[in-house]
């Protein structure tokens, strides 16, 4: 399913009915946070309110390539005293600020406001090192044909002769290695900026984009990611780095879910996968990392938090090593050398082709150069005095050289050498089934990867228990969680069964009287 907004909400409701599932089974986040479920009346009320004030304040249409995008904090202060969707005044309090953020998010998810109209200052700009070069070249060649001009008066005419009557040559194009030639677009996403001193130089070295967030990544960050993916045109692998705590475990899922949702609009054909790589329980156990016990509101027991900083403090350099190892899984280490070899092979082929096609022209060029040499040697000594005479005597040769150059140009234009294709990157995509998010998966297959095996098995068992056979007509039907005791597929069958039982009851009474 690749649906947006209200269509997604309706789709999930219908799908839940068909499968005998509760809607909560078919979403990966909470009702108010999963973009595929946004579209309930309460969501739409807030979204339409935000759309109205967005238009009223003149903010619409500032996104995309425009520079004057709007930050929501500015909207907050402009709204003070204005009416909220329920008529109550908007105040300068945290509750109303969160109300605005929620309404803004719903409006963008439902397509009422362009996500790119809103600027994101909560998260810093990503460090982009992997991008398509502006001067990317296709396979081919560029001719280099000198002007073949004989010298005008100079003090060093023989050197001028050698320099300007060189043999023509061809240079292959499209064989220069660039990191953009690598097979994958890789990004490292990290929840906190305290690791920038480690990750930024590493990502720059490996031409890997680095996106740093403060807590949960925003819709703006995800849309910007999809813009980069669409521009690169390459399969994308997102490596997620976070603390190990309740929030850290949910953050990759939240980013994956937002990416899954918005990719339908911004990169529908993209191959995107996301996987948390740091911190994991195995890494915590391996390095014996200490945890902080933090109580969340309402928790009866503390939530164990292990910070990224603990890994770097206990095992200096290990974070960089883990990230480097994961990035290099998607890089072709021999690609640069193969580009060099391919360019050398193409150059050799061009040299051979040019020598074969221009043999007569080059021979004539050398003859003309030798014919010019004695004249130049003689007039070099008398240059100042005999400049005018030199020009007159060389004029016939210049005409001949122009003819040779014209002939060479025609021959080069007709060349169609069978140049080898530039090397294609080769990299194995490891652990094909182990990715938390894969854009090629269907909706239910992807949902399975968001659930734990136990959650998935429980959901399947619950759905099976809701599939019933009508006790009256024998038709299969699906009941809901609230009325699992239903025996009949619809009201008509229930009434028919009731009437049949009444007839049987009265029949038994009549038979009893006769007996």
Each PLM stretch: what is its role?
Residues 1-236, 249-458:
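Nucleic-acid enzyme cleavage-core boundary/entry regions
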Residues 245:
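Catalytic metal-binding/acid-base residues of hydrolase active sites
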Residues 461-515:
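BZIP DNA-binding basic region
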């Amino acid at each position: 399913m690749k649906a947006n907004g209200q269509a997604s909400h309706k789709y999930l409701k219908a799908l839940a009915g068909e499968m005998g599932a509760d809607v909560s089974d078919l979403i990966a986040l909470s009702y108010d946070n999963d973009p595929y479920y946004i579209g309930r009346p309460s969501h739409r009320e807030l979204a339409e309110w935000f759309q109205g004030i967005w238009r009223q304040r003149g903010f619409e249409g500032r996104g995309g390539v425009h520079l004057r995008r709007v930050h929501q904090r500015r909207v907050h202060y402009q709204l003070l005293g204005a009416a909220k969707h329920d008529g109550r005044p908007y105040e300068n309090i945290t509750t109303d600020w969160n109300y605005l953020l929620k309404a803004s998010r719903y409006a963008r998810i439902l397509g009422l406001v362009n996500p790119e109209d809103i600027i994101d200052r909560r998260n810093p700009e990503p460090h982009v090192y992997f991008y398509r070069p502006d001067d990317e070249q296709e396979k081919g060649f560029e001719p280099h044909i000198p002007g073949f001009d004989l010298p005008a008066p100079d003090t060093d005419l023989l050197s001028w002769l050698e320099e300007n009557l060189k043999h023509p040559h061809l240079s292959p194009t499209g064989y220069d290695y660039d990191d953009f030639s690598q097979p994958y677009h890789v990004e490292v996403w990290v929840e906190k900026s305290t690791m920038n001193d480690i990750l930024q130089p590493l990502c720059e070295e490996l031409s890997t984009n680095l996106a740093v967030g403060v807590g949960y990544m925003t819709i703006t960050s995800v849309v910007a990611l999809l813009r980069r993916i669409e521009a690169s045109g390459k399969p994308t692998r997102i490596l997620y780095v976070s603390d190990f705590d309740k929030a850290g475990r949910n953050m990759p899922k939240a980013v994956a879910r937002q990416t899954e949702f918005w990719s339908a609009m911004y990169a529908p054909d993209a191959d995107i996968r996301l996987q948390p790589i740091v911190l994991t329980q195995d890494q915590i156990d391996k390095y014996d990392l200490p945890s902080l016990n933090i109580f969340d509101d309402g928790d009866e027991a503390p939530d164990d938090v292990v910070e990224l900083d603990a890994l770097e403090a206990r095992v200096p350099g290990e974070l960089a090593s883990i990230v480097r190892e994961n990035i290099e899984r998607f890089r072709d280490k021999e690609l640069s050398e193969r580009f060099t070899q391919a360019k050398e092979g193409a150059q050799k082929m061009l040299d051979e082709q040019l020598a074969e096609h221009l043999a007569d022209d080059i021979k004539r060029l050398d003859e003309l150069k030798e014919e010019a040499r004695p004249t130049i040697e003689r007039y070099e000594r008398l240059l100042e005095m005999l400049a005018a005479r030199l020009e007159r005597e060389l004029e016939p040769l210049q005409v001949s050289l122009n003819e040779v150059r014209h002939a060479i140009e025609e021959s080069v234009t007709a060349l169609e050498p069978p140049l080898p294709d530039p090397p294609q990157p080769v990299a194995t995509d490891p652990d094909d089934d182990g990715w938390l998010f894969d854009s090629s998966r269907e909706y239910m297959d992807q949902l399975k990867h968001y659930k734990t095996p136990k959650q998935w098995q429980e959901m399947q068992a619950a759905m099976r228990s809701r599939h019933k056979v009508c006790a009256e007509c024998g038709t299969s039907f699906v009941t809901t969680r609230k009325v699992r005791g239903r025996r009949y597929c619809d009201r008509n069958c229930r009434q028919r069964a009731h009437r049949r039982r009444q007839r049987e009851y009265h029949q038994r009474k009549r038979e009893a009287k006769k007996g």
